[in-house]
Amino acid sequence: MQQRRPIRRALLSVSDKAGIIEFAQALSQRGIELLSTGGTARLLADAGLPVTEVSDYTGFPEMMDGRVKTLHPKVHGGILGRRGQDDGIMAQHGIQPIDIVVVNLYPFAQTVARPDCSLEDAVENIDIGGPTMVRSAAKNHKDVAIVVKSSDYPAIITELDNNDGSLTYPTRFNLAIKAFEHTAAYDSMIANYFGTLVPPYHGDTEQPSGHFPRTLNLNYIKKQDMRYGENSHQQAAFYIEEDVKEASVATAQQLQGKALSYNNIADTDAALECVKEFSEPACVIVKHANPCGVAIGDSILAAYERAYQTDPTSAFGGIIAFNRELDAATANAIISRQFVEVIIAPTVSSDALALLAAKQNVRVLTCGQWQARSAGLDFKRVNGGLLVQERDLGMVTAADLRVVSKRQPTEQELRDALFCWKVAKFVKSNAIVYARDNMTIGIGAGQMSRVYSAKIAGIKAADEGLEVAGSAMASDAFFPFRDGIDAAAAVGITCVIQPGGSIRDDEVIAAADEHGIAMIFTDMRHFRH
Protein backbone atom coordinates (compact mmCIF):
# COMPACT_ATOMS: atom_id res chain seq x y z
CA MET A 1 0.00 0.00 0.00
CA GLN A 2 1.42 3.34 -1.06
CA GLN A 3 1.97 5.44 2.03
CA ARG A 4 1.80 8.82 0.32
CA ARG A 5 -0.74 10.08 -2.20
CA PRO A 6 -0.20 13.33 -4.10
CA ILE A 7 -3.11 15.77 -3.89
CA ARG A 8 -3.91 17.30 -7.28
CA ARG A 9 -7.68 17.80 -7.24
CA ALA A 10 -9.99 18.80 -4.39
CA LEU A 11 -13.77 18.80 -4.09
CA LEU A 12 -15.13 21.31 -1.58
CA SER A 13 -18.79 21.48 -0.49
CA VAL A 14 -19.37 22.79 3.01
CA SER A 15 -22.32 24.01 5.03
CA ASP A 16 -20.08 25.55 7.70
CA LYS A 17 -17.96 28.04 5.76
CA ALA A 18 -15.56 28.82 8.64
CA GLY A 19 -11.99 28.82 7.34
CA ILE A 20 -12.90 27.44 3.92
CA ILE A 21 -11.65 30.43 1.90
CA GLU A 22 -8.24 30.36 3.58
CA PHE A 23 -8.01 26.59 3.18
CA ALA A 24 -9.01 26.73 -0.49
CA GLN A 25 -6.48 29.52 -1.08
CA ALA A 26 -3.76 27.37 0.46
CA LEU A 27 -4.73 24.42 -1.73
CA SER A 28 -4.83 26.57 -4.87
CA GLN A 29 -1.44 28.11 -4.08
CA ARG A 30 -0.03 24.58 -4.05
CA GLY A 31 -1.34 23.88 -7.52
CA ILE A 32 -4.39 21.88 -6.48
CA GLU A 33 -7.43 22.14 -8.76
CA LEU A 34 -10.65 23.17 -7.01
CA LEU A 35 -14.07 21.65 -7.69
CA SER A 36 -17.04 22.95 -5.75
CA THR A 37 -20.82 23.18 -5.53
CA GLY A 38 -23.50 25.82 -5.02
CA GLY A 39 -22.88 28.33 -2.28
CA THR A 40 -19.35 27.10 -1.60
CA ALA A 41 -18.38 27.59 -5.25
CA ARG A 42 -19.85 31.10 -5.30
CA LEU A 43 -18.01 32.00 -2.10
CA LEU A 44 -14.67 30.80 -3.50
CA ALA A 45 -15.23 32.52 -6.85
CA ASP A 46 -16.11 35.78 -5.10
CA ALA A 47 -12.81 35.45 -3.22
CA GLY A 48 -11.01 35.37 -6.59
CA LEU A 49 -10.15 31.68 -6.54
CA PRO A 50 -10.09 29.56 -9.72
CA VAL A 51 -12.92 27.11 -9.08
CA THR A 52 -14.86 24.75 -11.34
CA GLU A 53 -18.54 24.18 -10.61
CA VAL A 54 -19.34 20.48 -10.24
CA SER A 55 -22.24 20.93 -12.68
CA ASP A 56 -19.78 22.21 -15.32
CA TYR A 57 -17.52 19.21 -14.68
CA THR A 58 -20.32 16.63 -14.85
CA GLY A 59 -22.26 18.34 -17.63
CA PHE A 60 -25.36 17.84 -15.51
CA PRO A 61 -27.01 20.80 -13.77
CA GLU A 62 -28.02 21.03 -10.15
CA MET A 63 -31.73 20.29 -9.92
CA MET A 64 -34.70 19.93 -7.60
CA ASP A 65 -33.70 23.00 -5.55
CA GLY A 66 -30.23 21.57 -4.96
CA ARG A 67 -31.39 18.12 -3.87
CA VAL A 68 -29.37 16.58 -6.71
CA LYS A 69 -25.97 18.05 -7.47
CA THR A 70 -23.13 15.66 -6.59
CA LEU A 71 -24.94 12.33 -7.08
CA HIS A 72 -23.20 11.63 -10.38
CA PRO A 73 -20.75 8.93 -11.60
CA LYS A 74 -18.16 11.54 -12.55
CA VAL A 75 -18.13 12.67 -8.91
CA HIS A 76 -18.36 9.34 -7.13
CA GLY A 77 -16.26 7.55 -9.71
CA GLY A 78 -13.54 10.14 -9.10
CA ILE A 79 -13.76 9.52 -5.37
CA LEU A 80 -14.21 5.74 -5.33
CA GLY A 81 -11.91 4.91 -8.22
CA ARG A 82 -9.03 2.69 -7.13
CA ARG A 83 -5.77 4.10 -8.39
CA GLY A 84 -3.90 1.60 -10.53
CA GLN A 85 -6.97 -0.64 -10.82
CA ASP A 86 -9.83 1.49 -12.16
CA ASP A 87 -7.77 3.92 -14.24
CA GLY A 88 -8.94 2.47 -17.56
CA ILE A 89 -12.66 2.66 -16.87
CA MET A 90 -12.23 6.15 -15.44
CA ALA A 91 -10.46 7.33 -18.59
CA GLN A 92 -13.09 5.68 -20.79
CA HIS A 93 -15.85 7.71 -19.14
CA GLY A 94 -13.94 10.95 -18.65
CA ILE A 95 -13.78 10.59 -14.89
CA GLN A 96 -11.05 12.63 -13.22
CA PRO A 97 -9.59 11.37 -9.92
CA ILE A 98 -10.54 13.45 -6.88
CA ASP A 99 -7.80 13.25 -4.25
CA ILE A 100 -9.27 15.17 -1.32
CA VAL A 101 -12.92 15.75 -0.40
CA VAL A 102 -13.80 18.59 1.97
CA VAL A 103 -17.39 18.29 3.17
CA ASN A 104 -19.47 19.14 6.21
CA LEU A 105 -23.17 18.56 6.40
CA TYR A 106 -26.42 20.50 6.54
CA PRO A 107 -27.05 21.88 10.05
CA PHE A 108 -29.75 19.37 11.02
CA ALA A 109 -29.20 19.67 14.79
CA GLN A 110 -29.39 23.46 14.74
CA THR A 111 -32.51 23.35 12.57
CA VAL A 112 -34.53 20.97 14.75
CA ALA A 113 -33.42 22.82 17.90
CA ARG A 114 -35.44 25.85 16.77
CA PRO A 115 -38.83 26.05 18.50
CA ASP A 116 -40.50 26.93 15.19
CA CYS A 117 -38.95 24.04 13.24
CA SER A 118 -41.53 22.23 11.13
CA LEU A 119 -41.33 18.68 9.83
CA GLU A 120 -40.72 20.11 6.36
CA ASP A 121 -37.81 22.20 7.67
CA ALA A 122 -36.30 19.11 9.26
CA VAL A 123 -36.69 17.02 6.11
CA GLU A 124 -35.09 19.67 3.90
CA ASN A 125 -32.07 19.78 6.22
CA ILE A 126 -31.31 16.09 5.81
CA ASP A 127 -28.13 16.04 3.77
CA ILE A 128 -27.96 13.30 1.13
CA GLY A 129 -25.13 14.16 -1.23
CA GLY A 130 -22.80 15.23 1.57
CA PRO A 131 -22.83 12.00 3.60
CA THR A 132 -22.60 10.01 0.36
CA MET A 133 -19.40 11.80 -0.64
CA VAL A 134 -18.04 11.54 2.89
CA ARG A 135 -18.61 7.78 3.04
CA SER A 136 -17.26 7.26 -0.47
CA ALA A 137 -14.04 9.10 0.33
CA ALA A 138 -13.68 7.39 3.70
CA LYS A 139 -14.17 3.97 2.11
CA ASN A 140 -11.46 4.74 -0.44
CA HIS A 141 -9.08 6.27 2.11
CA LYS A 142 -6.30 4.19 0.56
CA ASP A 143 -6.28 6.76 -2.22
CA VAL A 144 -8.42 9.70 -1.07
CA ALA A 145 -8.41 12.07 1.91
CA ILE A 146 -11.70 13.15 3.49
CA VAL A 147 -11.95 16.28 5.65
CA VAL A 148 -15.08 16.90 7.74
CA LYS A 149 -13.70 19.24 10.42
CA SER A 150 -12.38 22.73 9.77
CA SER A 151 -10.01 22.28 12.72
CA ASP A 152 -8.04 19.85 10.52
CA TYR A 153 -7.34 22.41 7.78
CA PRO A 154 -4.04 23.77 9.18
CA ALA A 155 -2.55 20.32 9.85
CA ILE A 156 -3.38 19.18 6.32
CA ILE A 157 -1.60 22.15 4.76
CA THR A 158 1.40 21.53 7.00
CA GLU A 159 1.56 17.88 5.96
CA LEU A 160 1.27 18.76 2.29
CA ASP A 161 4.25 21.09 2.69
CA ASN A 162 6.25 18.47 4.56
CA ASN A 163 5.54 15.70 2.03
CA ASP A 164 5.96 17.34 -1.37
CA GLY A 165 2.23 17.88 -1.85
CA SER A 166 1.18 14.45 -0.57
CA LEU A 167 -0.73 13.10 2.42
CA THR A 168 0.42 9.97 4.22
CA TYR A 169 -1.67 6.85 4.76
CA PRO A 170 -1.87 7.27 8.58
CA THR A 171 -3.31 10.75 8.05
CA ARG A 172 -5.83 9.53 5.46
CA PHE A 173 -6.83 6.62 7.71
CA ASN A 174 -7.33 8.91 10.72
CA LEU A 175 -9.37 11.35 8.62
CA ALA A 176 -11.51 8.45 7.37
CA ILE A 177 -12.30 7.37 10.93
CA LYS A 178 -13.30 10.95 11.77
CA ALA A 179 -15.55 10.89 8.71
CA PHE A 180 -17.34 7.70 9.77
CA GLU A 181 -17.75 9.14 13.28
CA HIS A 182 -19.18 12.29 11.71
CA THR A 183 -21.75 10.52 9.54
CA ALA A 184 -22.70 8.16 12.39
CA ALA A 185 -23.37 11.13 14.67
CA TYR A 186 -25.31 12.88 11.90
CA ASP A 187 -27.54 9.89 11.21
CA SER A 188 -28.02 9.43 14.96
CA MET A 189 -29.35 12.98 15.28
CA ILE A 190 -31.80 12.37 12.45
CA ALA A 191 -32.96 9.03 13.85
CA ASN A 192 -33.34 10.50 17.35
CA TYR A 193 -35.43 13.40 16.06
CA PHE A 194 -37.78 11.37 13.90
CA GLY A 195 -37.92 8.67 16.56
CA THR A 196 -39.89 11.02 18.79
CA LEU A 197 -42.61 11.36 16.14
CA VAL A 198 -43.51 7.68 15.79
CA PRO A 199 -44.85 5.08 18.24
CA PRO A 200 -42.30 3.10 20.27
CA TYR A 201 -41.53 -0.56 19.62
CA HIS A 202 -42.71 -1.51 23.12
CA GLY A 203 -45.47 -0.24 25.41
CA ASP A 204 -48.08 2.08 23.93
CA THR A 205 -47.62 1.49 20.21
CA GLU A 206 -50.51 3.80 19.28
CA GLN A 207 -48.98 7.11 20.39
CA PRO A 208 -45.76 8.88 19.30
CA SER A 209 -42.71 8.30 21.49
CA GLY A 210 -42.74 11.98 22.43
CA HIS A 211 -39.87 13.44 24.44
CA PHE A 212 -37.65 10.36 24.15
CA PRO A 213 -37.03 8.66 20.77
CA ARG A 214 -37.93 5.02 20.31
CA THR A 215 -34.27 4.26 19.58
CA LEU A 216 -31.71 6.31 21.48
CA ASN A 217 -28.42 6.91 19.67
CA LEU A 218 -25.61 8.47 21.69
CA ASN A 219 -22.27 9.85 20.53
CA TYR A 220 -19.48 10.68 22.96
CA ILE A 221 -15.80 11.34 22.35
CA LYS A 222 -13.10 9.67 24.42
CA LYS A 223 -11.16 12.25 26.39
CA GLN A 224 -8.86 9.92 28.28
CA ASP A 225 -8.20 6.35 29.30
CA MET A 226 -8.16 5.82 33.05
CA ARG A 227 -5.63 3.75 34.97
CA TYR A 228 -8.64 1.80 36.17
CA GLY A 229 -12.30 2.29 36.99
CA GLU A 230 -14.14 2.53 40.28
CA ASN A 231 -11.99 -0.39 41.42
CA SER A 232 -8.54 -1.48 40.28
CA HIS A 233 -9.78 -4.61 38.49
CA GLN A 234 -12.07 -2.57 36.20
CA GLN A 235 -10.89 -0.92 32.98
CA ALA A 236 -12.33 2.53 32.31
CA ALA A 237 -12.30 5.60 30.08
CA PHE A 238 -13.81 9.10 30.20
CA TYR A 239 -16.05 10.15 27.30
CA ILE A 240 -17.40 13.65 26.78
CA GLU A 241 -20.08 15.29 24.68
CA GLU A 242 -18.90 17.02 21.53
CA ASP A 243 -19.09 20.81 21.57
CA VAL A 244 -20.34 20.95 25.18
CA LYS A 245 -20.49 24.60 26.24
CA GLU A 246 -21.44 24.51 29.93
CA ALA A 247 -18.63 24.81 32.49
CA SER A 248 -18.17 21.27 33.77
CA VAL A 249 -15.67 18.62 34.74
CA ALA A 250 -15.79 17.55 31.08
CA THR A 251 -14.59 20.96 29.86
CA ALA A 252 -12.27 21.75 32.76
CA GLN A 253 -8.58 22.45 32.19
CA GLN A 254 -6.13 20.70 34.50
CA LEU A 255 -3.34 23.03 35.60
CA GLN A 256 -1.32 20.57 37.67
CA GLY A 257 -1.37 17.23 39.42
CA LYS A 258 -1.65 13.58 38.51
CA ALA A 259 -4.14 12.37 35.92
CA LEU A 260 -7.71 12.39 37.15
CA SER A 261 -9.01 9.00 38.23
CA TYR A 262 -12.47 7.60 37.58
CA ASN A 263 -13.54 8.42 41.13
CA ASN A 264 -11.92 11.87 40.97
CA ILE A 265 -14.05 12.77 37.95
CA ALA A 266 -17.28 11.50 39.51
CA ASP A 267 -16.64 13.32 42.79
CA THR A 268 -15.49 16.52 41.09
CA ASP A 269 -18.68 16.56 39.05
CA ALA A 270 -20.75 16.23 42.24
CA ALA A 271 -18.85 19.06 43.96
CA LEU A 272 -18.95 21.43 41.00
CA GLU A 273 -22.64 20.92 40.25
CA CYS A 274 -23.48 21.55 43.90
CA VAL A 275 -21.47 24.77 44.19
CA LYS A 276 -23.17 26.08 41.05
CA GLU A 277 -26.41 26.36 43.04
CA PHE A 278 -25.07 29.33 45.01
CA SER A 279 -24.67 32.92 43.88
CA GLU A 280 -22.75 34.04 46.97
CA PRO A 281 -19.09 32.99 47.53
CA ALA A 282 -19.41 29.28 48.32
CA CYS A 283 -17.34 26.18 48.97
CA VAL A 284 -18.39 22.53 48.63
CA ILE A 285 -16.31 19.64 49.93
CA VAL A 286 -17.24 16.20 48.59
CA LYS A 287 -16.22 12.70 49.62
CA HIS A 288 -17.48 9.60 47.81
CA ALA A 289 -19.94 11.66 45.74
CA ASN A 290 -21.61 13.18 48.83
CA PRO A 291 -21.13 16.70 50.17
CA CYS A 292 -19.52 16.50 53.60
CA GLY A 293 -19.27 20.27 54.08
CA VAL A 294 -20.92 23.23 52.34
CA ALA A 295 -20.90 26.89 53.29
CA ILE A 296 -21.37 30.43 52.07
CA GLY A 297 -19.09 33.22 53.26
CA ASP A 298 -18.07 36.80 52.66
CA SER A 299 -15.11 35.37 50.74
CA ILE A 300 -14.18 31.94 49.46
CA LEU A 301 -11.66 31.67 52.31
CA ALA A 302 -14.45 32.20 54.82
CA ALA A 303 -16.65 29.77 52.90
CA TYR A 304 -13.89 27.13 52.94
CA GLU A 305 -13.18 27.58 56.65
CA ARG A 306 -16.86 27.09 57.46
CA ALA A 307 -17.38 24.17 55.07
CA TYR A 308 -14.35 22.40 56.54
CA GLN A 309 -15.76 22.75 60.07
CA THR A 310 -18.74 20.54 59.23
CA ASP A 311 -16.71 17.34 58.99
CA PRO A 312 -12.90 17.66 59.00
CA THR A 313 -12.50 13.89 59.18
CA SER A 314 -14.42 13.25 55.97
CA ALA A 315 -12.85 16.26 54.25
CA PHE A 316 -9.47 14.46 54.32
CA GLY A 317 -8.74 13.32 50.77
CA GLY A 318 -11.83 15.07 49.46
CA ILE A 319 -12.71 17.22 46.47
CA ILE A 320 -13.11 20.98 46.96
CA ALA A 321 -15.12 23.19 44.61
CA PHE A 322 -15.51 26.97 44.60
CA ASN A 323 -17.72 29.34 42.61
CA ARG A 324 -15.18 32.19 42.66
CA GLU A 325 -11.51 32.49 41.68
CA LEU A 326 -9.21 30.52 43.97
CA ASP A 327 -6.90 33.03 45.65
CA ALA A 328 -3.58 32.52 47.42
CA ALA A 329 -4.98 32.86 50.94
CA THR A 330 -7.51 30.11 50.36
CA ALA A 331 -5.02 27.85 48.58
CA ASN A 332 -2.60 28.24 51.48
CA ALA A 333 -5.32 27.45 54.02
CA ILE A 334 -6.19 24.24 52.20
CA ILE A 335 -2.73 22.79 51.70
CA SER A 336 -1.56 23.73 55.19
CA ARG A 337 -4.55 22.02 56.78
CA GLN A 338 -5.55 18.94 54.83
CA PHE A 339 -4.81 16.40 52.14
CA VAL A 340 -6.95 17.13 49.10
CA GLU A 341 -7.37 15.17 45.87
CA VAL A 342 -8.85 17.85 43.59
CA ILE A 343 -9.53 21.58 43.72
CA ILE A 344 -11.79 23.06 41.04
CA ALA A 345 -12.74 26.71 40.58
CA PRO A 346 -13.74 29.00 37.71
CA THR A 347 -10.21 30.44 37.71
CA VAL A 348 -7.05 30.22 39.83
CA SER A 349 -4.87 33.24 40.57
CA SER A 350 -1.19 33.06 39.64
CA ASP A 351 -0.23 33.48 43.30
CA ALA A 352 -2.46 30.58 44.30
CA LEU A 353 -1.02 28.40 41.57
CA ALA A 354 2.51 29.21 42.72
CA LEU A 355 1.63 28.05 46.24
CA LEU A 356 -0.07 24.90 45.00
CA ALA A 357 3.00 24.01 42.93
CA ALA A 358 4.62 22.85 46.16
CA LYS A 359 1.99 20.09 46.27
CA GLN A 360 2.32 18.62 42.80
CA ASN A 361 0.06 15.67 43.56
CA VAL A 362 -2.89 18.00 44.12
CA ARG A 363 -4.99 18.13 40.98
CA VAL A 364 -5.98 21.73 40.22
CA LEU A 365 -8.69 22.40 37.65
CA THR A 366 -10.29 25.50 36.19
CA CYS A 367 -13.69 25.33 34.51
CA GLY A 368 -14.40 28.95 33.62
CA GLN A 369 -17.31 30.98 34.92
CA TRP A 370 -20.72 29.46 34.25
CA GLN A 371 -23.93 31.01 33.04
CA ALA A 372 -27.34 29.33 33.02
CA ARG A 373 -27.29 25.55 33.18
CA SER A 374 -28.01 23.59 30.03
CA ALA A 375 -30.86 21.15 29.77
CA GLY A 376 -29.76 17.62 29.02
CA LEU A 377 -30.15 13.99 29.92
CA ASP A 378 -28.91 11.82 32.77
CA PHE A 379 -28.25 8.11 32.30
CA LYS A 380 -28.11 5.15 34.63
CA ARG A 381 -26.99 1.77 33.34
CA VAL A 382 -28.95 -1.27 34.46
CA ASN A 383 -28.26 -4.82 33.40
CA GLY A 384 -29.65 -5.06 29.88
CA GLY A 385 -30.80 -1.48 29.62
CA LEU A 386 -30.39 2.22 30.22
CA LEU A 387 -32.53 4.53 32.34
CA VAL A 388 -32.80 7.99 30.80
CA GLN A 389 -34.21 11.12 32.40
CA GLU A 390 -33.97 14.88 32.14
CA ARG A 391 -31.30 16.53 34.27
CA ASP A 392 -32.63 17.63 37.65
CA LEU A 393 -32.41 21.39 37.17
CA GLY A 394 -35.37 22.11 39.40
CA MET A 395 -34.94 24.46 42.35
CA VAL A 396 -37.46 26.38 44.41
CA THR A 397 -37.34 30.00 45.54
CA ALA A 398 -38.91 31.59 48.59
CA ALA A 399 -41.99 32.41 46.52
CA ASP A 400 -42.57 28.70 45.79
CA LEU A 401 -42.65 27.58 49.42
CA ARG A 402 -45.71 26.61 51.45
CA VAL A 403 -45.64 26.93 55.23
CA VAL A 404 -47.88 24.15 56.58
CA SER A 405 -47.17 24.45 60.31
CA LYS A 406 -48.84 26.72 62.83
CA ARG A 407 -45.59 28.62 63.40
CA GLN A 408 -44.14 30.69 60.59
CA PRO A 409 -40.37 30.44 60.03
CA THR A 410 -38.25 33.44 60.93
CA GLU A 411 -36.31 35.17 58.17
CA GLN A 412 -33.12 33.46 59.34
CA GLU A 413 -34.81 30.05 59.42
CA LEU A 414 -36.13 30.63 55.92
CA ARG A 415 -32.64 31.51 54.64
CA ASP A 416 -31.17 28.44 56.33
CA ALA A 417 -33.96 26.23 55.00
CA LEU A 418 -33.35 27.33 51.41
CA PHE A 419 -29.60 26.87 51.89
CA CYS A 420 -29.83 23.32 53.17
CA TRP A 421 -32.47 22.47 50.57
CA LYS A 422 -29.93 23.29 47.85
CA VAL A 423 -27.39 21.03 49.53
CA ALA A 424 -29.86 18.17 50.04
CA LYS A 425 -30.38 18.00 46.28
CA PHE A 426 -26.81 16.68 45.95
CA VAL A 427 -26.77 14.25 48.88
CA LYS A 428 -27.49 10.58 48.22
CA SER A 429 -30.96 9.50 49.30
CA ASN A 430 -32.18 9.20 51.93
CA ALA A 431 -30.71 12.66 52.51
CA ILE A 432 -30.93 14.86 55.59
CA VAL A 433 -29.03 18.13 55.95
CA TYR A 434 -28.75 20.31 59.06
CA ALA A 435 -27.67 23.90 58.47
CA ARG A 436 -27.36 27.16 60.34
CA ASP A 437 -26.15 30.58 59.21
CA ASN A 438 -25.51 29.31 55.66
CA MET A 439 -23.28 26.47 56.82
CA THR A 440 -23.93 22.75 57.00
CA ILE A 441 -23.52 21.40 60.51
CA GLY A 442 -24.53 17.81 59.89
CA ILE A 443 -25.23 15.64 56.83
CA GLY A 444 -26.87 12.23 56.88
CA ALA A 445 -26.52 10.47 53.53
CA GLY A 446 -27.57 7.28 51.84
CA GLN A 447 -29.43 5.55 54.65
CA MET A 448 -32.23 3.10 53.97
CA SER A 449 -34.49 4.82 56.52
CA ARG A 450 -34.93 8.58 56.69
CA VAL A 451 -34.94 8.68 60.48
CA TYR A 452 -31.43 7.20 60.56
CA SER A 453 -30.17 9.83 58.15
CA ALA A 454 -31.57 12.42 60.59
CA LYS A 455 -29.84 10.71 63.51
CA ILE A 456 -26.52 10.56 61.64
CA ALA A 457 -26.71 14.27 60.82
CA GLY A 458 -27.14 14.94 64.54
CA ILE A 459 -24.23 12.66 65.44
CA LYS A 460 -21.99 14.41 62.91
CA ALA A 461 -22.82 17.80 64.40
CA ALA A 462 -22.22 16.56 67.95
CA ASP A 463 -18.86 15.01 66.99
CA GLU A 464 -17.63 18.39 65.74
CA GLY A 465 -19.11 20.34 68.64
CA LEU A 466 -21.47 22.26 66.36
CA GLU A 467 -24.62 23.63 67.91
CA VAL A 468 -27.78 22.21 66.35
CA ALA A 469 -30.30 24.16 68.43
CA GLY A 470 -32.03 26.72 66.21
CA SER A 471 -30.91 25.06 62.97
CA ALA A 472 -32.91 24.15 59.87
CA MET A 473 -33.24 20.64 58.48
CA ALA A 474 -33.81 19.64 54.84
CA SER A 475 -35.07 16.28 53.62
CA ASP A 476 -34.78 15.37 49.95
CA ALA A 477 -38.13 13.53 50.05
CA PHE A 478 -41.19 13.45 52.28
CA PHE A 479 -41.22 12.02 55.79
CA PRO A 480 -43.25 8.79 55.75
CA PHE A 481 -43.64 8.90 59.55
CA ARG A 482 -43.31 11.44 62.32
CA ASP A 483 -40.19 9.76 63.75
CA GLY A 484 -37.85 11.92 61.64
CA ILE A 485 -39.44 15.06 63.08
CA ASP A 486 -39.18 13.70 66.61
CA ALA A 487 -35.48 12.95 66.04
CA ALA A 488 -34.93 16.47 64.71
CA ALA A 489 -36.73 18.05 67.66
CA ALA A 490 -34.63 16.02 70.08
CA VAL A 491 -31.47 17.79 68.90
CA GLY A 492 -32.99 21.26 68.66
CA ILE A 493 -34.04 21.67 65.00
CA THR A 494 -36.55 24.53 64.74
CA CYS A 495 -37.37 24.56 61.02
CA VAL A 496 -37.88 21.70 58.54
CA ILE A 497 -38.06 21.96 54.76
CA GLN A 498 -39.29 18.95 52.79
CA PRO A 499 -41.32 18.16 49.66
CA GLY A 500 -44.46 16.93 51.39
CA GLY A 501 -46.76 14.46 49.71
CA SER A 502 -46.87 11.61 52.22
CA ILE A 503 -50.19 9.94 53.05
CA ARG A 504 -49.22 10.78 56.64
CA ASP A 505 -48.49 14.47 56.04
CA ASP A 506 -51.11 15.39 58.66
CA GLU A 507 -49.29 13.31 61.31
CA VAL A 508 -45.93 14.79 60.32
CA ILE A 509 -47.28 18.35 60.44
CA ALA A 510 -48.90 17.63 63.80
CA ALA A 511 -45.52 16.44 65.12
CA ALA A 512 -43.93 19.69 63.95
CA ASP A 513 -46.65 21.68 65.69
CA GLU A 514 -46.17 19.69 68.90
CA HIS A 515 -42.48 20.59 68.91
CA GLY A 516 -43.00 24.20 67.82
CA ILE A 517 -41.14 23.52 64.56
CA ALA A 518 -41.84 25.60 61.47
CA MET A 519 -42.48 23.24 58.54
CA ILE A 520 -42.12 24.22 54.89
CA PHE A 521 -43.28 22.21 51.87
CA THR A 522 -41.46 22.63 48.54
CA ASP A 523 -43.74 20.35 46.48
CA MET A 524 -40.56 19.21 44.71
CA ARG A 525 -38.54 16.09 45.45
CA HIS A 526 -34.81 15.59 44.90
CA PHE A 527 -34.11 11.87 45.10
CA ARG A 528 -30.50 11.05 44.20
CA HIS A 529 -29.44 7.44 43.78
Swiss-Prot record:
GO terms for cellular component: cytosol. One of its GO terms (biological process) is 'de novo' IMP biosynthetic process. InterPro entries: AICAR_Tfase_dup_dom_sf, Cytidine_deaminase-like, MGS-like_dom, MGS-like_dom_sf, PurH-like. It catalyses: (6R)-10-formyltetrahydrofolate + 5-amino-1-(5-phospho-beta-D-ribosyl)imidazole-4-carboxamide = 5-formamido-1-(5-phospho-D-ribosyl)imidazole-4-carboxamide + (6S)-5,6,7,8-tetrahydrofolate; IMP + H2O = 5-formamido-1-(5-phospho-D-ribosyl)imidazole-4-carboxamide. It comes from the Bacteria. Gene3D superfamilies: 3.40.140.20, Methylglyoxal synthase-like domain. SMART domains: AICARFT_IMPCHas (SM00798), MGS (SM00851). Keywords: Hydrolase, Multifunctional enzyme, Purine biosynthesis, Transferase. PANTHER family: BIFUNCTIONAL PURINE BIOSYNTHESIS PROTEIN ATIC (PTHR11692:SF0), BIFUNCTIONAL PURINE BIOSYNTHESIS PROTEIN PURH (PTHR11692). The IMP cyclohydrolase activity resides in the N-terminal region. CDD domains: IMPCH. Belongs to the PurH family. Residues 1-148 form the MGS-like domain. This is Bifunctional purine biosynthesis protein PurH. Its EC number is 2.1.2.3, 3.5.4.10. It holds the Pfam family MGS. Pathway: Purine metabolism; IMP biosynthesis via de novo pathway; 5-formamido-1-(5-phospho-D-ribosyl)imidazole-4-carboxamide from 5-amino-1-(5-phospho-D-ribosyl)imidazole-4-carboxamide (10-formyl THF route): step 1/1; Purine metabolism; IMP biosynthesis via de novo pathway; IMP from 5-formamido-1-(5-phospho-D-ribosyl)imidazole-4-carboxamide: step 1/1. SUPFAM superfamilies: Cytidine deaminase-like, Methylglyoxal synthase-like. GO terms for molecular function: IMP cyclohydrolase activity; phosphoribosylaminoimidazolecarboxamide formyltransferase activity.
